[in-house]
């Protein structure tokens, strides 16, 4: 009753003709207010004074609350009270793809594959390079060992040949000092004999190159050669100087000339089989 009196012009609006929130609110409101207002004026009734009732205050409060509720319904003409929460929904939908991208990680898997591929190739190349160096090093060691053995064998054989060919001359030249001391002879080849004035020579036989004189512990043919008296010293010197014309030097000068000449006259074939056995 009071609603019709107070809101007679507003109550005539139909909900399908009311303006929706956010769509041409001004135009639809003017058209609706002019076309659908009530044509009859408000009726006035005569009433008598009434005694105030305690429930009238409660009724008035309820009326005010109802009016406020109706105004709230007018703001939401489509009866969709969740439209205001649409922004929050879009915000949540934008966050979901971001989380999905972190879980999938397609780019990280591809990058890991590219990183592992060159690492395998590098390890392979390193192994091949180390293998080549190892082979060259082993060959170098083998050739070096063979060269050392070859040089050692050549040096040993050269020493054996030198001892076998020129041993007689060198030993005789080294032993032919001015003191003219007799030395030990080689077994079965060279024999040291005692010559005049303590001079010794090396010969193949006991009396070879002896010039007809006696060897050690032999019979003295000419006793005058061993006479060391003062009056015959000059004669022995003359006899020694002129008696042997075969190039033998005097006992008092050029003592090392004859041993060097005899060293050159030594035979070349001095038991080569012995030197070869030592080389092996």
Swiss-Prot record:
Region Disordered, annotated ranges: 110-137, 151-177, 219-280
Keywords carried by this UniProt record: Plasmid
Basic and acidic residues composition bias: residue spans: 110-122, 167-177, 223-261, 269-280
Disulphides: none
Protein name, per record: Uncharacterized 31.6 kDa protein in TAR-I ttuC' 3'region
Keyword Iron-sulfur: no
Taxonomy, superkingdom: Bacteria
């Amino acid at each position: 009753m009071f609603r019709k009196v107070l809101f007679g012009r507003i109550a005539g609006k139909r909900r399908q003709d009311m303006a929706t929130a956010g769509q041409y609110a001004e135009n639809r409101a003017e058209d609706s207010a002019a076309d659908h207002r009530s044509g009859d004026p408000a009726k006035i009734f005569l009433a008598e004074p009434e005694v105030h009732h305690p429930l009238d205050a409660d009724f008035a409060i309820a009326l005010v609350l109802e009016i406020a509720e109706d105004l709230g319904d007018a703001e939401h003409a489509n009866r969709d009270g969740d439209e205001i929460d649409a922004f929050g929904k879009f915000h949540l939908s934008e966050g979901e793809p971001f989380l999905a991208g972190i879980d999938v990680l397609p780019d990280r898997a591809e990058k890991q594959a590219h990183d592992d591929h060159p690492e395998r190739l590098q390890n392979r190349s390193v192994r091949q390079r180390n293998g080549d160096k190892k082979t060259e090093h082993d060959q170098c060691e083998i050739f070096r060992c063979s060269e050392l053995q070859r040089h050692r064998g050549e040096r040993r054989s050269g020493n054996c040949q030198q001892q076998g060919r020129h041993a007689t001359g060198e030993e005789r030249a080294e032993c032919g000092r001015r003191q003219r001391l007799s030395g030990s002879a080689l077994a079965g080849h060279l024999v040291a004999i005692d010559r005049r004035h303590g001079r010794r020579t090396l010969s193949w036989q006991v009396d070879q190159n002896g010039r007809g004189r006696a060897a050690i512990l032999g019979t003295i043919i000419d006793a005058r050669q061993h006479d060391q008296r003062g009056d015959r010293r000059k004669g022995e010197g003359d006899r020694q100087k002129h008696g042997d014309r075969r190039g033998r030097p005097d006992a008092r000068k050029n003592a090392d000339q004859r041993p060097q000449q005899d060293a050159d006259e030594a035979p070349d074939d001095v038991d080569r089989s012995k030197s070869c056995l030592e080389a092996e």
